[in-house]
Amino acid sequence: MQGLKSAISFFTIIPVKADLNKNIVFFFTITGAITGLMAASIFYLTSFINQLLASVASVSFLIIIYGFNHADAVLDLGDTFMVHDPEKKKIIIKDVYHGTGSVVTFFIIYIITISLLSSFNSIQGSIALILSETISRFSMLMSMYKSNSFSGGISEIFISYFDKPFKITFFNFLVIILIFLIFYKYIIFTMFSLISIVISYYFKSHEQKIFNGINGDIIGFTGELSRLISLLLILISFKLI
């Protein structure tokens, strides 16, 4: 259980004391399921007041519970979309200041996420939050597969922990399967969200080619992008099927 405590302590502001443990990579999706369940509870309870309020409250909660780290990743990577030169991108992504690109990217990611959530009813939105958050963490984990770090630091540590890819991937994917089984009545609608894993991995691969590696910001952005795409795919399936 040290790996789970380490994951909760590292990724969230939940007051759990634990050192960074190598087994943390086995608990990415469980951490996502926990935070997703918390966000879903907020969404469900506030949706009876107003759907938009519920969406804003739950997304705000997710930004805060992760200590603003993933939101910061969106801001950091956002500015790099404004330039094409790889070396300039590396300088910009490490810059503590944020420009137009970061602000626009931030609003695109989170306004679309809020808009998508506001289109669900209380039950659908709650399920979508749990699943999309779990898949988001799985996408972050998979972003480390066949990757190297260009900046050192925490990304290099996590990539070194990903030394048993099949075992780690299988264990994390079991959590997603469990969620599908719990919400089996909605499996036809929710299974399309798995496509977001492929799309977000393609995004990571694209960024890795540009930067000649990845860092914590790319990993964090991949998770936020995966959540958005998951919600979009779930919403489309609910509307069309």
Swiss-Prot record:
InterPro entries: CobS. Its EC number is 2.7.8.26. It catalyses: alpha-ribazole + adenosylcob(III)inamide-GDP = adenosylcob(III)alamin + GMP + H(+); alpha-ribazole 5'-phosphate + adenosylcob(III)inamide-GDP = adenosylcob(III)alamin 5'-phosphate + GMP + H(+). It is found in: Cell membrane. Keywords: Cell membrane, Cobalamin biosynthesis, Magnesium, Membrane, Transferase, Transmembrane, Transmembrane helix. It is an enzyme of class 2 (transferase). Joins adenosylcobinamide-GDP and alpha-ribazole to generate adenosylcobalamin (Ado-cobalamin). Also synthesizes adenosylcobalamin 5'-phosphate from adenosylcobinamide-GDP and alpha-ribazole 5'-phosphate. This is Adenosylcobinamide-GDP ribazoletransferase.
